[in-house]
Amino acid sequence: MRVQPSVKKICRNCKIIRRHGIVRVICTDPRHKQKQG
């Protein structure tokens, strides 16, 4: 899980979602997981 000021899609499987006001990237590749913080 990477915490970044701005989250971006890395590959075509990445999806940007909002959970409880936190922007996250979920992907089939675990290295692509990101969280905005």
UniProtKB/Swiss-Prot annotation:
GO CC annotation: cytoplasm; ribonucleoprotein complex; ribosome
UniProt-recorded Gene Ontology molecular function terms: structural constituent of ribosome
Keywords noted in UniProt: Ribonucleoprotein, Ribosomal protein
Pfam families registered for this protein in UniProt: Ribosomal_L36
Matching InterPro entries: Ribosomal_bL36, Ribosomal_bL36_sp
The keyword Oxidoreductase is assigned to this record: no
Any GO BP annotation: translation
PROSITE patterns: RIBOSOMAL_L36
Family (UniProt): Belongs to the bacterial ribosomal protein bL36 family.
Identification of the protein by name: Large ribosomal subunit protein bL36
Organism: Laribacter hongkongensis (strain HLHK9)
Name of the coding gene: rpmJ
